[in-house]
Amino acid sequence: MADFSRLPGPNADLWDWQLLAACRGVDSSLFFHPEGERGAARSARENSAKEVCMRCPVRAECAAHALAVREPYGVWGGLTEDEREELMGRARNRLVAATASASAGGEAAGPH
């Protein structure tokens, strides 16, 4: 289940991008997998959802939203849940590496 505490407050301006989404009016089952869907069926559905996303004028905003709130389900902005998790994992790894590098560099420089 999504953690709604991470969602932005009730500010309609933050959500206006959704009014321009190519998926408006499209059956949401295209973007969210049914329980137990696997393999070729899941891949085909996700590819169909991504086709809608590829022609969407607010694809970047949609993907950014899904990443920001850590949306655990569905295709958002052309990214599946697995793809979003992979992106977040890579970002975490880069942050950890940068933090470790900065710490090591700071220690090597000595006192200021």
Curated annotation (Swiss-Prot):
Q: Where in the cell is it found?
A: Cytoplasm
**Residues where [4Fe-4S] cluster binds:** C23, C53, C56, C62
> What PROSITE patterns is this protein classified in?
4FE4S_WBL
**Which key words are in the record?**
4Fe-4S, Cytoplasm, Disulfide bond, DNA-binding, Iron, Iron-sulfur, Metal-binding, Sporulation, Transcription, Transcription regulation
- What induces or represses its expression, per the UniProt entry? Expressed in exponential phase. Expressed from 2 promoters at the onset of sporulation, no longer expressed in mature colonies.
Q: Name one GO cellular component term.
A: cytoplasm
Q: How does activity depend on pH?
A: Optimum pH is 7.0 to 8.0 for 4Fe-4S stability.
Q: State any GO BP term from the record.
A: negative regulation of DNA-templated transcription
Gene Ontology MF: a single term = protein-disulfide reductase [NAD(P)H] activity
Q: Tell me the null mutant phenotype.
A: Forms white aerial mycelium. Sporulation is reduced, spores are heat sensitive, lyse frequently and highly irregular in size. Septum placement and spore cell wall thickness is irregular.
Q: How is it modified after translation?
A: Can be nitrosylated by NO, 8 NO react per cluster. These complexes are quite stable under anaerobic conditions, but degrade slowly aerobically. Upon Fe-S cluster removal intramolecular disulfide bonds are formed.
Specify the 4Fe-4S Wbl-type domain's residue ranges: 22-86
Q: What task does this protein carry out?
A: Acts as a transcriptional regulator. Probably redox-responsive. The apo- but not holo-form probably binds DNA. Plays a positive role in prespore maturation and the initiation of sporulation septation.
What is annotated about its quaternary structure and interactions? The 4Fe-4S form is a monomer; upon oxidation forms a disulfide-bonded homodimer.
UniProt cross-references to HAMAP family, sorted A to Z: WhiB
Q: Which family does it belong to?
A: Belongs to the WhiB family.
- Protein name per the record: Transcriptional regulator WhiD
Q: Which organism is it from?
A: Streptomyces coelicolor (strain ATCC BAA-471 / A3(2) / M145)
